[in-house]
Amino acid sequence: MKLKKFLVPVDGSDYSMRAAKYAAELTDFTDGKIILVYCHRPFPIVLGEPYFQNAINKITEKSNKLIEPYRQLFQKTGTSFTERILQAPAPNAICEVAKTEKLDMIIMGSRGRNKLEGLLLGSCTQRVLHMAPCPVLVIR
């Protein structure tokens, strides 16, 4: 079994940064590639112009700002990566990308930014573990 293609979902938490660092190290050994995924909330469609466009711009700006440290990490380590910013519930989007791209592994943090959900694992991580079409490596 060759592990070459990894998905790293991120949310700005320390846990997802640890997962990204681990994935970067792993790709050194496997000559692998990473798909970096960030999922944001749906655009507020009830807003009219110009408020709708302003909301889109703010969400896009926030998304780019959030994933910038991960971009810098992968560029600094010479890790081959692509990125996707998606408007969808994170567990569904993560599993769909993993399935569509035929990824070898999902590498994700054990918890997100909301530490109240879940006892041992974050709720997103729990759902991905149950729905994923490939192995999931959970990093603490």
PLM features: what roles do these ranges have?
Residues 1, 72-106:
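Structural beta-alpha unit
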Residues 43-44, 91, 115:
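Generic structural signal for helix capping and beta-alpha/helix-loop junctions
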Residues 25, 96-140:
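Gly/Ser-rich helix-loop-strand patches that form or flank binding pockets
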Residues 67-71:
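A conserved short alpha-helical segment within the catalytic HATPase_c
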Residues 35, 82, 137:
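Conserved beta-strand positions in the Rossmann-like core of class I SAM-dependent methyltransferases
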Residues 53-65:
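A short acidic, glycine-rich active-site loop
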Residues 2-50, 73, 77:
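Small/aliphatic-rich secondary-structure junction motif
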